[in-house]
A protein has these predicted regions:
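Noncatalytic alpha-helical scaffold of FAD-dependent oxidoreductases
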Residues: 1-235
Length: 235
């Protein structure tokens, strides 16, 4: 990338102005020309929500000021965008070979350089949103013991990929990201498409702990039979 932005937030008692990125203005564009900005606490925490990071740029007209003023309350924001994506899913499937890639990859800090060398060489899709995250010191009981030993780090680097086209005939980037994340001892969000087989899935997630929780909380199997079946989507 030819442009890097580091966003640091700190509390102040007073502000000379307060920016609003829920309507006309667009946060991810503002970072190109603003070195300093003031937002309320809630607006800072949800500063990417209006655009779903920058997904609105993939929808014709949705970054135009007039359309945002007229229909912003119905179209903008992650909840609205998800609602419309579900409504239009049959049409989108006819127009696209596969859905665009929208997922988060959590890479151990000591493996991030390896991951980024691969990313800069192959996908090369930007913007790439990066956020450091701390793992609980006591460990995370839903990660398999062996995979936790592979992670072997208190810090994970969240790499968020939003709106990456995935129409190549011979390469499914969703599947490729999943494989590379596992190769770098990381984790991926499971609200996206999932491709791993059951054996690989439970190399990552702690099957006995999930099974125990399932038996206690859903003893009659009213919901999906197990975590793998709930999250796995071969399509």
């Amino acid at each position: 990338p030819d442009h890097l932005t580091l966003c640091l937030g700190e509390y102040v008692a007073r502000a000379p102005y307060v920016s609003d990125y829920r309507h006309d203005d667009i946060f991810y564009k503002s970072t190109r020309h603003r070195a300093l900005d003031y937002l309320g606490i809630e607006d800072y925490l949800f500063r990417y929500d209006t655009e779903c990071h920058w997904l609105t740029r993939t929808i014709p007209g949705l970054e135009h000021p007039l359309l945002r003023r007229l229909l912003g309350d119905r179209l903008l924001g992650s909840i609205n965008l998800q609602r419309w994506s579900r409504r239009l899913a049959p049409l989108i499937r006819q127009l696209q070979r596969r859905p665009d890639v929208n997922l988060d990859l959590l890479i151990p800090d000591h493996r991030f350089a390896d991951f980024h060398r691969w990313y800069a060489r192959e996908p090369r899709f930007y913007p790439l949103w990066i956020l450091p995250m701390c793992l609980p010191r006591a460990g995370y009981p839903w990660i398999a013991d062996e995979h936790a030993r592979r992670i072997d780090d208190d810090l994970l680097i969240d790499c968020a990929i939003r709106g990456m086209p995935n129409d190549e005939v011979d390469r499914d980037w969703s599947e490729r990201f999943e494989a590379q994340t596992f190769a770098c001892d990381g984790l991926k969000t499971r609200c996206a498409r999932n491709h791993d087989i059951r054996q690989r899935f439970f190399q990552i997630y702690h099957q006995p702990n999930y099974t125990t929780a399932k038996q206690r909380l859903d003893p009659h199997g009213l919901f999906h039979r197990d975590l793998f079946e709930r999250l796995h989507d071969p399509n």
